[in-house]
A protein has these predicted regions:
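Predominantly the C-terminal beta-signal and adjacent terminal strand-loop region
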Residues: 269, 278-331
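Residues on the lipid-exposed face of transmembrane beta-strands in outer-membrane beta-barrel proteins
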Residues: 84-88, 133-141, 181-187, 200, ...
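Surface-exposed strand-loop-strand hairpins of Gram-negative outer-membrane beta-barrel proteins
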Residues: 56-81, 118-120
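Cleavable N-terminal export/targeting peptides
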Residues: 1-43
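Transmembrane beta-strands of outer-membrane beta-barrel pores
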Residues: 52-58, 101-105, 161-169, 200-206, ...
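Residues that define the transmembrane beta-barrel architecture of outer-membrane proteins
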Residues: 78-82, 125-133, 173-181, 219-225, ...
Length: 331
């Protein structure tokens, strides 16, 4: 199992997100052997991290500025993001959980649609909580065979499942809830890992600008693809790796049944989220103690953020941002 911990921890670093994606590297093992006389831990691997990252310029759909010529452009938003993540592996699969607390600067103000008069916007930045869980069950481990493998191409196929949930104190007041289920494919690479999942995706959310009882919205069930990777950069002679994810959600409809009454609930577009981090194991470099402290820089691209599509008068749906942070493996 010596290859699993590094892969799992790299996956956790790559997913310090909000956002969507996500299970760590799978356990590739035959059926469990009989229990030894001295039972070991239930988990083959477990890692919990606390991290901080700074992101700029992030964007939010509808957060924009009007230029002198009357046109609109996206308003950049600095964000401070605090995260706790946990990953573990057991005989039959993996679990991954992450929670981001995202604090926006005043460019993305907090607000409510429930104030006296119906709308209020504050002079301080909004706070968002975004949680995500992904789990896998290895079909090879469950069957005690290697039937779910293609030598040299795929090491394992697993059942994959999970959910996302968020809340944010803006006037829009999103309360995203989604569930996913499908298959995960672990590719056979010389070092590190590349995993791809194909899911069915169902989302429920909230639009604070709709009137009751139509603030709660339910989107169509659509295909979703998640790709997670971590690859060591051994040729550098440094404890460096490149880690990240890509996430694709197909157009999921409007979310409302009465489109004539809520025409401003526009059709969603294909959503694409990609993040790539360059990760340095600082503990290994400085103290020769690996997997304790990581520092990272990265780039995030988000097209049609949360499915929203850009128009001439509606910006903030395309995000191109840089990030930098530090992560501590605590237990």
């Amino acid at each position: 199992m010596s290859g699993i911990p590094k892969a799992l921890m790299a996956a956790v670093v790559s997913l310090l997100v909000t956002g969507p994606v996500f299970a760590a590297d799978l356990v590739k093992a035959p059926a469990p052997a009989p229990l030894p006389d001295a039972p070991g831990s239930f988990f083959l691997f477990s890692d919990t991290q606390f991290s901080y990252r700074y992101q700029f310029p992030s964007s939010e759909p509808g957060v924009q500025v009007q230029n002198s010529d009357g046109s609109f452009s996206t308003r950049g938003i600095p964000k401070h993001i605090y995260n706790i993540s946990h990953a573990n592996a057991w005989a039959y699969g993996t679990n991954f959980f992450t929670l981001d607390i995202l604090k926006s600067a005043s460019q993305d103000p907090g607000g409510t649609t429930n104030a006296p008069g119906g709308f209020a916007q504050y002079d301080y930045g909004a706070t968002e909580a975004y949680g995500l869980y992904r789990g896998t069950l290895s079909l090879n481990a469950l069957t005690g065979t290697k039937a779910f493998a293609v030598p040299g191409i795929i090491k394992d196929i697993s059942l994959s499942y999970g959910f996302d949930a968020n809340a944010k104190n803006t006037a829009f007041g999103p309360r995203k809830r989604d569930v996913v289920g499908g298959l995960n494919f672990a590719f056979d690479v010389p070092a590190g890992f590349i995993n791809a999942s194909v899911h069915a995706y169902k989302e429920w959310n909230r639009n604070g600008f709709n009137t009751y009882p139509n603030r709660d919205v339910s989107f169509d069930t659509v295909p979703e693809i998640e790709i997670v990777y971590s690859l060591p950069l051994s040729f550098t002679g440094l404890p460096l790796s490149i880690a990240g994810f890509n996430n694709i959600v197909l157009p999921k409809g409007r979310g409302v049944t009465d489109v004539t009454a809520f025409a401003f609930n526009a059709k969603t577009g294909l959503e694409f989220l990609s993040r790539t981090n360059l990760v340095l194991d600082l503990g290994k470099l400085v103290y020769d103690t690996p997997n304790k402290v990581d520092v990272f820089i990265g780039f995030q691209y988000w097209l049609n953020k949360f499915g929203a599509q850009e128009t001439a008068t509606f910006k903030g749906t395309e995000e191109k941002s840089f990030l930098a942070g530090v992560s501590f493996h605590v237990f």
